[in-house]
Amino acid sequence: MAEDSESAASQQSLELDDQDTCGIDGDNEEETEHAKGSPGGYLGAKKKKKKQKRKKEKPNSGGTKSDSASDSQEIKIQQPSKNPSVPMQKLQDIQRAMELLSACQGPARNIDEAAKHRYQFWDTQPVPKLDEVITSHGAIEPDKDNVRQEPYSLPQGFMWDTLDLSDAEVLKELYTLLNENYVEDDDNMFRFDYSPEFLLWALRPPGWLLQWHCGVRVSSNKKLVGFISAIPANIRIYDSVKKMVEINFLCVHKKLRSKRVAPVLIREITRRVNLEGIFQAVYTAGVVLPKPIATCRYWHRSLNPRKLVEVKFSHLSRNMTLQRTMKLYRLPDVTKTSGLRPMEPKDIKSVRELINTYLKQFHLAPVMDEEEVAHWFLPREHIIDTFVVESPNGKLTDFLSFYTLPSTVMHHPAHKSLKAAYSFYNIHTETPLLDLMSDALILAKSKGFDVFNALDLMENKTFLEKLKFGIGDGNLQYYLYNWRCPGTDSEKVGLVLQ
């Protein structure tokens, strides 16, 4: 992915204008980017303004101080003094600080905002420009014969560490980093809470490599402060099937967002992936970067309306009482699809045939082997639920699946967690999709979920409104790294990333 030689252009992306993030971005610092879409659902439209401070510089220093683990390099803005005796150098320093502050743009949430945005990091990468009209298909850069062997340089005071997630203490460290610093909604009310068991499922599919679990630690005390991951996947893009990686879990500790660590993390995981002969990647982000292949929207279906209102995940509609809202979202106690049962190991071959055949109709979709199907779909408590539909003659005709991803509820006296089910892959050949997804809601409700989330990809638009989903307030963009192809509509996306 990122260039394996540090050119002047790529080095520029580590200067003051580049900003670190939590989520795939590389050009934004103080905002927590929504790599998954906001866990706040209906919330998250507002941006938080954050105060910035700046360390004092020596006059005529000619540049910034070097990075260190203890130097926050925050920007402090002072009002210009009305005293005419204030030294000219002081006024110039103030003016420069104000210019730097104005240059620190917030993340672009839509194409209009993105058109005005500067992407100093992504402009150095093999991705299409936002205004580029694309009609061709293929790699932007050819595969490289000589890949950089040495890791990229981190700011002073930090060190690389490959995380061995089979070590319970290391896994706990990663869980803590993500739990305290990963994606949250703009109002700081909800934050994704990936369990250690979920992380093992998401980060260790068939073909996973230890070196693709890339961490950053403070050199002095070995505290884990940054992470990025890659997992292998065969992805079909229109008519081409490519071995690539899915990039996920880019996270930088909140106190180190001014260190420009995110661009280095992206470059380093790129180098490590390139060393294995892979030169394409797919990733998602809640912000607009150069250049989305597709834009999807999250929808939310209330399963526990009382709790969702109490934690302010959702709000009562005008002229609606809580009792009427609870009645509106009430579900049957039992499913109605005949032959619906949990997936078992004996179903792996049939499920693989169902999913690979069904996904051929989409422009962006995985191609799975039996080992991958077993990993991603065999039920695991509190991680993944898959139910198949078996006909009277023993043939599997359909299946539904959803994964578990709770969010921590911040600042609430009673509720500490919001249990969310996320629609995964739902394949139908005989059962109407509307009936299949109605049963998915009933099953999720019976398992204690508070909300059921789904993107408007694949055929999901056919059931979202009918099953009383409400539209979310944020988009999820899909991106390809080092691959150029025309964009597509959300209903032609057949890929779901955790």
Curated annotation (Swiss-Prot):
InterPro entries referenced in this protein's UniProt entry, alphabetically: Acyl_CoA_acyltransferase, NMT, NMT_C, NMT_CS, NMT_N
Catalytic activity: N-terminal glycyl-[protein] + tetradecanoyl-CoA = N-tetradecanoylglycyl-[protein] + CoA + H(+); N-terminal glycyl-L-lysyl-[protein] + tetradecanoyl-CoA = N-terminal glycyl-(N(6)-tetradecanoyl)-L-lysyl-[protein] + CoA + H(+)
The keyword Transferase is annotated on this UniProt entry: yes
Record's GO cellular component terms: cytoplasm; cytosol; Golgi apparatus; host cell; plasma membrane
Major place of residence: cytoplasm
Spans traversing the lipid bilayer: none
Positions of the UniProt region annotated as Disordered: 1-88
PTM sites of type Phosphoserine: S38
Alphabetized UniProt keyword annotations: Acyltransferase, Cytoplasm, Membrane, Phosphoprotein, Transferase
Residues binding tetradecanoyl-CoA, per UniProt: H117, W122, L250, V252, S258, R260, V261, A262
PROSITE patterns: NMT_1, NMT_2
Superkingdom of origin organism: Eukaryota
Compartments where located: Cytoplasm; Membrane
Gene Ontology terms, MF aspect: glycylpeptide N-tetradecanoyltransferase activity; peptidyl-lysine N6-myristoyltransferase activity
Record's compositionally biased regions (Polar residues): 61-86
Stretches with biased composition (Basic residues): 45-57
Entry EC no(s): 2.3.1.97, 2.3.1.-
Cited Gene3D superfamilies: 3.40.630.170
Membrane topology, as annotated: Peripheral membrane protein
Family listed: Belongs to the NMT family.
Role of this protein: Adds a myristoyl group to the N-terminal glycine residue of certain cellular and viral proteins. Also able to mediate N-terminal lysine myristoylation of proteins: catalyzes myristoylation of ARF6 on both 'Gly-2' and 'Lys-3'. Lysine myristoylation is required to maintain ARF6 on membranes during the GTPase cycle.
Protein name stated in the entry: Glycylpeptide N-tetradecanoyltransferase 2
Organism in which the protein naturally occurs: Homo sapiens (Human)
Encoding gene, per UniProt annotation: NMT2
